[in-house]
Amino acid sequence: MKDNYFNLLNKLQLVNNNSNCFFQLIWTNSLMFFTQHNYFRDYYVKNKDIYIPNIIKRNNKCIIFSSGANWYWNDNKYRTDQHELTVKGMEIFIKEYPNIRLILMHPDETFIEGYPKCLEYLNFNRNALIDINSFNIIDKEKKFDSIYNSNFYAYKQHYLLEEIDNYKIALIYYHRNSNLNQAYYIKKKDIDEGYELEKRLLENKKFTLLNMANGKYKFLSKKEINEYYNESYSGLCLSDIEGACLVSVEYLLSGLPVISVKNVGGRDKFLKQMGIYAITDLNYNINEIEEAIQYYKN
């Protein structure tokens, strides 16, 4: 894998055909802001007017790029009302601040369906913006057969790992109700089920939660995460619905091949361009996941 590292970097640079359009906007406009779609949901639900920069309140001309959780706020089996709340927030925002040019960035063009027609859209994978200096190959002894860096949400499908056998799996996650990852819209039932699954995983010695110390979640720096990646043979992406999936590129830059289950939202399109560096479209089946882990371990 190390011998082909620069080939991988070239692939990552070429994977986003619309990056030139994005960077042209960056270079030719002096005032820009970056946010995620859930900002507008919160703006509508919780009226976060105090978080709007004064320069926007003064109605100065500027561009807001909104990206990130675009797939998540569309109606899906996990969040049936978030898309509607987000759209309402966007409509109110652009009405109150008419000098704002709001551009929505999507890694999968199919997800522009249902957003206000007055907005601009850019088919853009935000993984193109990752700091490539933070993740790289370093000489570390392998300690884990695979690693899964993922917040503890239902769509991340941690349950797929429960029956894993004879493999050491490193986990990095912040529980949905931890002080590092609070989400007011998560139902208590989902939180309780998440804690039960977390408990079962941690009782199994095959799993190591890297960002927990003395029973509390701790923040990991990019340097620490990169070191943990380099101590693993492969990186897991198990969500069934997800957009760009930032950790997939972190894995790749750290020299890890990616193991991905069937996915809707953009990650599958990205990883299929990675050739030998990714196994995609696995069924939600532990046997297939284990076979992929063994393949890259060899």
Predicted regions and their residues:
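Short acidic alpha-helix that forms the nucleotide-activated donor recognition element
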Residues: 217-232, 253
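Short alpha-helical segment that forms part of, or immediately flanks, the ligand-binding pocket
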Residues: 226, 248-253, 267-268
